């Protein structure tokens, strides 16, 4: 029995069928639709807000800002992170669905910035709390640099393998130690706590025999001509 051939059918299928893997298809769909959660605490966030305007138009990159971490796959930290804010940041990151990404924007987020030298409450780098995918230095970085960081993150997503990423997050994640502070009384109210101040005993409270005994024990110095 002769087989029927469809030359037109074979020619169209050869030009339209694409062979790929499920991992590459997943990466391609995610890199074009990043939904960021904006975690801005200082002036760096103002630079990111300028991307919303028509000059840069970050909608063309598929960015859709979300207000809930459960709907976001990218968190962008911009500004100083303090010890008091650290638990909230970690909680937001843990509420994001997998796979999730982090962009650390600005010197204050990456290293603590100018507050890292003499501040007791500043986190010296947000990577001590959550894993960071892209570091964006600057004080503050320009909007063009933010677009470049997003482009680099898209390239990273297109090359990654999801099981390897989960394993890397489990091995390379680190946390800061818990800082314990002791709350004292304020000295700006005028009511000073006597326990924090040292007051030497007055001479009226010292017995006379003790005072003269100490005075006689001190040797006198003679002047030699």
UniProtKB/Swiss-Prot annotation:
Pfam families: Oxidored_q6. It catalyses: a plastoquinone + NADH + (n+1) H(+)(in) = a plastoquinol + NAD(+) + n H(+)(out); a plastoquinone + NADPH + (n+1) H(+)(in) = a plastoquinol + NADP(+) + n H(+)(out). One of its GO terms (biological process) is photosynthesis, light reaction. It is found in: Plastid, Chloroplast thylakoid membrane. It is a peripheral membrane protein. GO terms for cellular component: chloroplast thylakoid membrane; respiratory chain complex I. It comes from the Eukaryota. Its EC number is 7.1.1.-. SUPFAM superfamilies: HydA/Nqo6-like. Its cofactor is [4Fe-4S] cluster. Gene3D superfamilies: 3.40.50.12280. Binds 1 [4Fe-4S] cluster. [4Fe-4S] cluster binds at residues 43-44, 108, 139. InterPro entries: NADH_UbQ_OxRdtase-like_20kDa, NADH_UQ_OxRdtase_20Kd_su. It is an enzyme of class 7 (translocase). Keywords: 4Fe-4S, Chloroplast, Iron, Iron-sulfur, Membrane, Metal-binding, NAD, NADP, Plastid, Plastoquinone, Quinone, Thylakoid, Translocase, Transport. The keyword Amino-acid biosynthesis does not apply. GO terms for molecular function: 4 iron, 4 sulfur cluster binding; iron ion binding; NADH dehydrogenase (ubiquinone) activity; quinone binding. Belongs to the complex I 20 kDa subunit family. NDH is composed of at least 16 different subunits, 5 of which are encoded in the nucleus. NDH shuttles electrons from NAD(P)H:plastoquinone, via FMN and iron-sulfur (Fe-S) centers, to quinones in the photosynthetic chain and possibly in a chloroplast respiratory chain. The immediate electron acceptor for the enzyme in this species is believed to be plastoquinone. Couples the redox reaction to proton translocation, and thus conserves the redox energy in a proton gradient. This is NAD(P)H-quinone oxidoreductase subunit K, chloroplastic. The gene is ndhK.
